[in-house]
Amino acid sequence: MTNFYKVFLAVFILVCCNISHAAVSFIGSTENDVGPSQGSYSSTHAMDNLPFVYNTGYNIGYQNANVWRISGGFCVGLDGKVDLPVVGSLDGQSIYGLTEEVGLLIWMGDTNYSRGTAMSGNSWENVFSGWCVGNYVSTQGLSVHVRPVILKRNSSAQYSVQKTSIGSIRMRPYNGSSAGSVQTTVNFSLNPFTLNDTVTSCRLLTPSAVNVSLAAISAGQLPSSGDEVVAGTTSLKLQCDAGVTVWATLTDATTPSNRSDILTLTGASTATGVGLRIYKNTDSTPLKFGPDSPVKGNENQWQLSTGTETSPSVRLYVKYVNTGEGINPGTVNGISTFTFSYQ
């Protein structure tokens, strides 16, 4: 009888000590500041290389490995949400607005900054798929980091950003785990910071208004539709800061919506059936006209120089072209504007 009680007691203790329950408690702060107080960051970029991202690494961030204490098989993931307005995108990631000139790229996720999820939009999204703790006590953390973005074309300037609420991360129990009344959401505010933004550009050495005298020709020199004859030539010269790549767009001043390669003649022209095309350097393909804008990627924008040239220039050739509508002799006048983009 004595031996029976000893065995029963041993089995009871073994079963008792392996019973555990999933549990979670909040050990973090509900309000958290991202980045150092009064941070200051400096960078230099070409004027139209926009949006321009300040490569601040993980310096503007918040990281805490101990926000929730979990145990006993508790399963937890993380969701994140940004409350700032979306003002653009870069490589599929939202740019969030802080001021008219400054925006943010934002990442949220687990404790490790490098695993942060690039945030897009203003809805809750999965930023950490999660894990299940074993029969022991551990913690779940989180991280947020941001990078400032210059949004608008401007000369060199200093931008100050005030403390701003940016969004939240919430703990997401799964696989039967429940948080009960435990705090699941933490909020984040971006500490104030200053950007010292230096821009580089170019100076036009050629007069801003260039008149190209067009040679007189006879209709017989353009016998068929599409035939061309050189009418005149000119050059554009610039002086650039180091590292600036110059792009340019021609705009048809008479018909700004023109996206073809034939310049519209002005109302002062009396000739018909003839147009003007513009070529650069030794190109065999005429330049097309686009919107009057310096924005990077502007329609029909073309590269004038590389970033290694500080004194770039381009030779332009104007050619008459038979438009196929029957040529009637007269005067030919056309006006095109050039817009430079410093990238």
From Swiss-Prot:
Compartments reported by the entry: Fimbrium
Annotated signal peptide: 1-22
Stretches the record annotates as Disordered: 287-307
Residues where a carbohydrate binds: 65-66, 110-111, 138-141
Gene Ontology cellular component terms for the protein in this record: pilus
Gene3D superfamilies associated with the record: Bacterial adhesins - F17c-type, Fimbrial-type adhesion domain
Major localisation: other
Function (record text): Essential fimbrial adhesion factor that mediates binding to N-acetylglucosamine-containing receptors in the host intestinal microvilli, leading to colonization of the intestinal tissue, and diarrhea or septicemia. Also confers adhesiveness to laminin and basement membranes.
Organism: Escherichia coli
UniProt keyword annotations, A-Z: Disulfide bond, Fimbrium, Lectin, Signal, Virulence
Cross-referenced PANTHER family: FIMBRIAL SUBUNIT ELFA-RELATED, TYPE 1 FIMBRIN D-MANNOSE SPECIFIC ADHESIN
Cystine connections: 75-132
BP-aspect Gene Ontology terms: adhesion of symbiont to host; cell adhesion involved in single-species biofilm formation
Keyword Membrane: no
InterPro entries linked: Adhesion_dom_fimbrial, Adhesion_dom_fimbrial_sf, Adhesion_dom_sf, Bact_Fimbrial_Adh_Pro, Fimbrial_adhesin_lectin_dom
Fimbrillin-binding domain: region residues: 200-343
Composition bias type Polar residues, residue spans: 298-307
Protein name per the record: F17c-G fimbrial adhesin
Region (Receptor-binding lectin domain): 23-199
Signal listed as a keyword: yes
Family in the record: Belongs to the fimbrial protein family.
GO MF, any single term: carbohydrate binding
